[in-house]
């Protein structure tokens, strides 16, 4: 529906000499519905609480989704990547305990996505700790779950889940990340190896007890040595049984430039795909599922959340503008905005491009077993450098 409105809007200004392209839009925001008693003020307040900012502006204020002046990513570019219907969902507490039953079939769980033979799964995380205030809007911690499926000498990326946290202590963020790592059957974790990222890496480097699930997750460590800082982060972990699964992204002007260009290339080439917008997903997918139809309000909000995050990431990306005064690409968010969702997405894509895909394009045949030795320790996949 939104694409139809946008096209009609364009036709209003481009159809003067072509009557077949005539178009007209009449828009009325929520105030008119209140004035005529179609909706009450209380109903509008409730509707706003249930919407993300982007949906509220589009559906109730009739504001078109626009971008920043000098934007690096256009609406159409990112909107064309929103093609995935099915989202991944982490296990609820009830689902987790059900999964321990002898006759449990995980393929029947809503939100389960089977892992393909050549598939690699990545969790990419941009970390923040401070809470936003009325005077300053801080970034959220954002985690993206990305599937990378091999096709010839490239990987097709599918971002199937996102979640965000604000003002959460690092020790709790380590728990959330490890829990999601095993729920998603992930292979790698990508995160910023500076500032708060260092504290998080230190927390991940020790076993983590999950009181809700009554289980302990193993230690995890940084494996990459492409910068001295990354190597130092790997050396901080003293647990000999730690899983070597963390890629520490050490930002620099050059590395950020590569990250931005990699992200744009993945979108332009169609390699990067993400979830449909929330409005489309509800119409085309969720409203046809019994899990959504018979869910209460809280559960419906949980099921819609990944699609809302897809919209929020789009809105964030089209609000980024390029600093034209610098030779290397630098992206700036507006004064009232953030870019945590974009950074989480772009770091994950950077890892796939510069770590996974480069192995495929080498002349020699790349074999993961040549780089890592895998065994089972305590029921978990154990990976370490040799």
Report each predicted region and the residues it spans:
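Hydrophobic transmembrane alpha-helix bundles
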Residues: 31-38, 97, 226-231
């Amino acid at each position: 529906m939104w694409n139809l409105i946008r096209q009609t809007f364009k036709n209003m200004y481009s159809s003067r000499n072509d009557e077949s392209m005539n178009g007209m839009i009449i828009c009325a925001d929520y105030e008119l519905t209140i004035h005529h008693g179609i909706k009450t003020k209380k109903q509008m307040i409730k509707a706003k609480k249930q919407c993300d900012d982007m949906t509220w502006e589009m559906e109730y204020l009739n504001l078109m989704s626009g971008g920043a002046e000098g934007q690096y990513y256009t609406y159409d570019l990112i909107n064309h990547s929103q093609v995935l219907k099915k989202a991944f969902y982490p296990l609820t507490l009830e689902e987790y305990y059900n999964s321990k039953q002898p006759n449990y079939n995980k393929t029947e769980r809503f939100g389960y996505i089977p892992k393909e033979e050549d598939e690699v799964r990545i969790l990419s995380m941009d970390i923040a700790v401070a809470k936003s205030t009325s005077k300053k809007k801080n970034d959220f911690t954002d985690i993206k779950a990305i599937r990378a499926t091999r096709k010839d000498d490239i990987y097709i990326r599918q971002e199937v889940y996102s979640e965000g946290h604000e003002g959460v202590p690092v020790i709790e963020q380590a728990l959330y990340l490890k829990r999601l790592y095993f729920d998603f059957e992930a292979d790698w974790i990508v995160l910023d190896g500076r500032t708060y990222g260092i504290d998080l890496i230190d927390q991940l480097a020790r076993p983590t007890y999950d009181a809700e699930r009554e289980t302990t997750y193993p230690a995890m460590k940084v494996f990459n040595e492409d910068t001295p800082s990354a190597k130092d982060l790997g050396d901080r972990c003293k647990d000999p049984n730690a899983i070597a699964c963390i890629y520490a992204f050490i930002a620099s002007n050059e590395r950020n430039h590569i990250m931005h260009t990699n992200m744009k290339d993945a979108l332009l080439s169609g390699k990067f795909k993400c979830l449909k917008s929330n409005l489309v997903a509800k119409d085309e997918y969720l409203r046809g599922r019994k899990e959504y139809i018979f869910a209460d309000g809280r559960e419906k909000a949980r099921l819609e959340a990944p699609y809302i995050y897809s919209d929020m990431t789009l809105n964030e990306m089209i609000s980024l503008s390029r600093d034209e005064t610098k030779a290397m690409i630098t992206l700036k968010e507006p004064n009232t905005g953030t870019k945590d969702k974009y950074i989480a997405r772009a770091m994950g894509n950077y890892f796939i491009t510069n770590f996974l895909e480069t192995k495929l394009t080498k002349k020699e045949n790349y074999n993961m077993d040549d780089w890592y030795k895998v065994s089972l320790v305590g029921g978990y996949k154990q990976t370490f450098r040799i």
